[in-house]
């Protein structure tokens, strides 16, 4: 027969087994192929015949940190808002690729960007980078990266980024 003492021992053992087999949040993310990423990138404007952007603005640059590699992008839109005369802020959308690695997984990320930037001398920029695909070990990648920093078409810029990239 089961005594209260035996039942208590079985329950404690069962709880210990369940706790040992339950993945932590970090283990769960790794098992699903999701990675928290952070770092910085530098970028500069690209002009000439290799820039085929509808609005004439292309960029190239380098990512460092959990995402590392080369960046190429082209602006699809640059749009003033009703407040642009007072704020000097414009919105933009762009398409870009990052060829390199995410935490050692090599390939190319395909990214759709949406953000805002100021035309004032400090060049503040905020960018939401939506990862919509990839190649190589980054095939099927999805995720979001938030970036903020500075950018000028004349001098380029630097931004810090953080977000999450899921692969597979």
Locate the predicted segments by residue.
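Bacterial N-terminal signal peptides that target proteins for export
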Residues: 2-12
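C-terminal region of N-terminal signal peptides and the immediate post-cleavage residues
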Residues: 8-10, 19-34
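Beta-strand-enriched cores of mature, soluble protein domains
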Residues: 29-168
């Amino acid at each position: 027969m089961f005594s209260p003492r035996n039942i208590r021992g079985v329950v404690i053992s069962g709880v210990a087994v369940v706790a040992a087999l339950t993945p932590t949040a970090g283990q769960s993310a790794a098992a699903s192929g999701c990675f928290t990423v952070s770092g910085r990138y530098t970028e500069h404007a690209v002009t000439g015949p290799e820039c085929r952007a509808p609005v004439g603005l292309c960029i190239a640059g380098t990512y460092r940190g959990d995402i590392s590699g080369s960046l190429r992008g082209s602006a699809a839109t640059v749009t003033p808002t009703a407040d642009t005369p007072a704020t000097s802020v414009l919105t933009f959308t762009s398409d870009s690729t990052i060829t390199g690695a995410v935490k050692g997984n090599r390939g190319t990320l395909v990214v759709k960007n949406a953000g805002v930037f100021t035309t004032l001398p400090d060049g503040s920029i905020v960018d939401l980078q939506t990862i919509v695909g990839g190649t190589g070990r980054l095939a099927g990648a999805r995720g979001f990266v938030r970036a903020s920093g500075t950018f000028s078409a004349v001098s380029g810029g630097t931004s810090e980024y953080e977000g999450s990239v899921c692969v597979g």
